[in-house]
Amino acid sequence: MTADTTRRAAAGRPGRSVKTAAAIATVTASLLLLSACGDQTQAAQARREAAKNRNPHAPLFSKLPKDVQDKAMLQVGSDITYKPVEFRSNGQVEGIDPDLAAAIGKELGIKLNFNNATFDTLMGGLKSQRYDIAMSAMTDTKDRQQGIDSTTGKKIGEGVDFVDYLNVGVSLYTQKGKTQGIDGWETMCGKKLAVQRGTVSHDLAKEKSSSCESSGQQPISIEAFDNDSEAQTRLRTGGVDAVSSDYPVAAYAVKVSGGGNDFQMVGGAPLKAAPYGIAVPKGQEKLRDAIKAAVELVIKNHAYDGVLAKWNVKDAGVKEVKINGGS
């Protein structure tokens, strides 16, 4: 190899480096431009969506915080697996909570958009601002208000405020026309009962069974299942005498299973009644109060009654909307 050849090779490297650098700069600029265009497109879509959802003439629009007015939407965290409170049907979110949320949104002049998540992640989602509120058959408790883990007793967050909108207890139901003499928990001694494992119904059944034994009667034979559907199947096939579930779940099963011919409610008013609440992060008092006013208006104009009648849960209705009414 000659000196000239070596020099030409050496001399060529800077040229290629310059070209490479120029190419990288061009690509980088293009990516930045695309990113900027993408951001602008998303922003434009958000503005169009807000314009579509926003109704500044709605009765309570002016009560909302400015940022909520601007985006005209609240992101709702919800575990959409709990028929009939919230569930999916043909790709759509349906149930008591979505219907009430639509009525609430109408009074606020915005849209409430449901996002599916497991129940145990909802409080964390509020804390991280992934969701603006949570509406998911969530019982209003002091622990949740104060941000305390009920299992460990440790404080894990600032907590939430609840706008209470339903009052839900535990119900009993049997095969239709085959009550086996059951007309309430007092007549369950010596009977077979199916429940969902780890629920309030399960705890109440064990409590009532102990009472049976204390009074010299036979205990309740309790069969615990992973979900209410399995418990209902056990009742339908005659394996147990009754099922206990949260009132909305029980009422829905009585209404729809077998066209309303499979089950019947027994025992009168639900026991262990406690409020379901819409969870709003602490420090969002203006949003909380606007939602409370919207629920009150939905009750006043009877849209509330219509939703509860549709889902056969009229007994769960409230007359007064409370903030943090749970214990």
Predicted region positions:
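Bilobed "Venus flytrap"/periplasmic-binding protein-like clamshell domains
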Residues: 83, 93-106, 167-227, 242, ...
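Acidic, polar ligand-binding/catalytic clefts
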Residues: 111-186
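A ligand-binding cleft/hinge motif common to bilobed small-molecule-binding domains
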Residues: 138-155, 206-207, 237, 241-272
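Extracytoplasmic small-molecule ligand-binding "clamshell" domains
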Residues: 46-138
